[in-house]
Curated annotation (Swiss-Prot):
The active site is at C82 (nucleophile), H169, E171. Keywords: ATP-binding, Glutamine amidotransferase, GMP biosynthesis, Ligase, Nucleotide-binding, Purine biosynthesis. It comes from Campylobacter jejuni subsp. jejuni serotype O:23/36 (strain 81-176). SUPFAM superfamilies: Adenine nucleotide alpha hydrolases-like, Class I glutamine amidotransferase-like, GMP synthetase C-terminal dimerisation domain. ATP binds at S223, G224, G225, V226, D227, S228, S229. The gene is guaA. PROSITE patterns: GATASE_TYPE_1 (PS51273), GMPS_ATP_PPASE (PS51553). This is GMP synthase [glutamine-hydrolyzing]. The keyword ATP-binding applies. Pfam families: GATase, GMP_synt_C, NAD_synthase.
Amino acid sequence: MKKADILVLDFGSQYTQLIARRLREQGVYAEILPFNVSLADIKAKEPKGIILSGGPASVYATDAYFCDKGIFDLGLPVLGICYGMQLMAHHYKATVAPAGHKEYGKANIEIKKDSALFKNLPKKQTVWMSHSDKVENLPDGFEVLATSENSPFCVFGNEDKKFFALQFHPEVQHSEFGKNILKNFAKYACNCESVWNMGSFAKTQAEKIREEVGNDKVLCAVSGGVDSSVVAALLASAIKEQVIVVFVDNGLLRSGEKEQVEFMFKNTLGIDLISIDASEIFLSRLANVRDPEQKRKIIGNTFIEVFEEEAKKHKDVKYLAQGTLYTDIIESSVVGASKTIKSHHNVGGLPEKMNLKLIEPLKEIFKDEVRALGLELGLSKEVVYRHPFPGPGLAIRIMGEVNRPSLELLRKVDVILLEELKSTGWYDKTWQAFCVLLNVKSVGVMGDNRTYDNAVCIRVVDASDGMTATFSHLPYEVLENISRRIINEVEGINRVVYDISSKPPATIEWE
């Protein structure tokens, strides 16, 4: 069993993955486990510390989530965050109750006592709160380490036991010294060393792949995006002669995508590629389907069917490799107590019964780590820094039913958006950019004539890992040129809007 420096127990926060990511940025390997993991499994990981995540439940409710109480008797440092903080207080007989004043957003805290958590940090800090419960009294044996205007027990701890509790979320970017607090917990409380990196990850994953696969063969599904390209490169580095790389044209690709993917794998990466045109079957099954969850599940099921049919043509194929990431896992909620945001076609969208076993070597890392891994494996920056493109493709960028006319319309406007962003230098400055066909018509005037045509939405966001995102502040002249070109060059569009929503509350993709 793989060891972990720090274990993060997931109580349902959508930001649980960020805790692990922030620690990994410091070179500390952190792993996430369900909140109800057994004490034996925790001991087997030989952690140097434990973090209890936030979550949507209340410790005083009948449906509260509780970890094994023996965690507090292991002699390990423990850090409780939000719900984890309230859980620690509850365990040590303090009272947790609904807060009269709920806190959501930025708050200012003031450090009241020196602590390992706040080593070399300023006394006053801005942090991110997100809670509706409060700790009403200090647990026995603990002392206040920091306060805020609405939280007199904002941070408390027991330095002897190295138990610490935070009401705020240090893992989100809005907590200005949150990264430092997590680093201090790992370094000064847990005595962790900064030795984890993508080089060591690549080596470990290659060994795991060889051990799991043995002499069998692996079907590797690729889309041309960075995730599947890195998976293919990782498999090739581990078991090159046993990998069959397959690209499926599902009819939901961007303009020129099929040709780009085929060229990249054969000419740039030097990997043999089997290309399958399955557009008819995908589009026929999506006909008259409007619900986004149904779209994702249909696409997921159909992908598996196509891959399983291809596998029958080759001997000893027992595995299917996919580029599932941590962000896919958390949004599809198959870790801990997290609530489902949406199913991903390669997580919640998969059929229950598959003839192929899944290999997902990237499911424990984030997008930025995938890119670092890609560079480590020798992929070009052009491949590694392509904008993310979802597995369900343009199907989840068309509101409502997916059909060929809508796909062609969306492809045309998408080409214009990307051309303008690349020509102005904004493509490389942003995380992701795409258009959404709203399937909503509006009145317009072109020349002397009335029009009643489609509206299209532009979505461009900045992010570091995809877990949170803000809309990109594109210059007005860039937006104006994009809008002008789309309306003038694409028949059937008379209105362009810009999505200025952040994640949360919105997701990056519309469906």
